[in-house]
Amino acid sequence: ASSLSQLRRRRQVVLSYFEDMHVEVSEASHDTPYLFQSLLYGQPLENKTRTWTHYVTPRGFAELMPFTNTASGNHIGWHIGRVDNWTGRWESIEKAQEASKNMVLFNATVGNKEGIAGKLTKNPHILITGATGEGKSFLAELIFLLTSLQDVKCLYVDPKRSIRKHFEAIAHHPDFEKRFPLLAKHIKQINFVTLDSKVKSNHGALDPIVMLDKDDAVSVSKNMLNYLIFSNKRIKVTMKQMTAISRAINKVVAQRQAGETVGLKHVLQELTNNPDSTIFEVGDYLTSIVENSILELAFSDGNVEGLSYDKRVTVLEVADLSLPDKDNQQDVTPEDKEINSTALMFALGAFCTRFGELNRYEDTIEFFDEAWVLMKSAEGRAVIQSMRRVGRFFNNVLCLITQSVHDAEGDDDTTGFGTLFAFREDNELPDILEHVGLTDNEENLEWIKNMISGQCLYKDVYGNLNMISIYNIFDSIDPLLKPMKATVSSNLEN
């Protein structure tokens, strides 16, 4: 308009026009442009904004969730899933993922780092628990693959032998090589090691006297031999025999430190060469159970290289490993193969410990699957404890994958775990709540009962606790994490 009076007339024409059409038009005031900024959540009210005050019911205000935090995970990291804020039960993990916009990022190497604002723990270790089929191996392998792309030295101990065959088949598939050439190259560069006692060149690869320093070699050797003896309840061992075993181990380890080519087999020879018949008997018994068994992987004459610590990414598996059932009763005598396999796990644990403490200035991480096998015995718990104590000082992360939240407990457990992933285990729901620091009440029990396969409780290094839906967003990694192929029957089921 050319004048104020003309502007007012035109304004009235517009209002009358819309009024005739029964359309309500609101007139703006001079401060309307600032309305949006003034009504932003948390914006302080000024004198000019008092007429814009919004009234809200307590229920409506509570839905805004003031002073609460639903963040989970690290600020920078790899996507491993999304937070699930619903207390109900989802039909599928995909629907839970689609319903959330709150991403969970994870970086396994920052747990022990200094100067990170808000971090409540400097404990770098990770514990993944849950029943079979709930998703703990999926999560562990996802974290392993993503972390292997960083400048981190990685070791995955796979007693189930589930990774190598599947990874290599996928990486060498022509279609995968064409679509994802860089990842295929990365998988092919992983140092896959399968220790098979039937292959003579593997004998002694896990010999503790060969691969460990003096104190650890003595400790692990004693643990292995003691376990082999005491697991057979038909054998009565005297103090004289136990003393002879300890002296033989100390002698052979001292010879190794002096530069002689000796190994754990020489300990057995020391016992069988003893003129005392009772000491000869225990040496002869140990020699008999080692011969032509999986234990040959840990017994050598010292003329072996042992496992390499130099490869950046290693997957270590042991052929013919027969692990005992976790639900076996303590008074049930395990089979010989189970006893031998468990004794060998002590050597595997010692290798992991040594792997993590070689270079304190290098980030390292070990994934130890089926860790409950070690936690069933006092000797095994000591091995796990030594692996955990490497921790912060050596920039080492230990990730234990096991079935029960009780598997990592111990009377002398002071090192704990800084990061917890607890998948559903129906027989331990109250224990899971206690494990993550929640009250055991009906509301919380109902909440975790609604967890589906692929969901878990996640407690991060900042102390945040949420239910999250584990989900992989990388098309290239997806085939590596899904070893079970769909069938006609499974497709028809949907």
Question: Model-predicted segments: where are they?
Answer:
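Basic- and hydrophobic-enriched, low-structure N-terminal and domain-boundary segments
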Residues: 1-124, 473-475, 492
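Anion (oxyanion) recognition and catalysis
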Residues: 19, 148, 392
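Short, glycine/acidic-rich hinge or "gate" loops at secondary-structure transitions
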Residues: 24-36, 164-166, 260-263, 361-364, ...
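C-terminal regions of RecA-like/P-loop NTPase motor modules
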Residues: 31-58, 62-79, 131-132, 408-494
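P-loop NTPase motor domains
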Residues: 58-104, 110, 161, 169-173, ...
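Conserved P-loop NTPase motor cores
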Residues: 110-134, 138-144, 155-164, 170-171, ...
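Conserved SF1/SF2 helicase motif Ia
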Residues: 150-152
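Flexible glycine/proline-rich, aromatic-decorated loop/lid segments
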Residues: 177-202
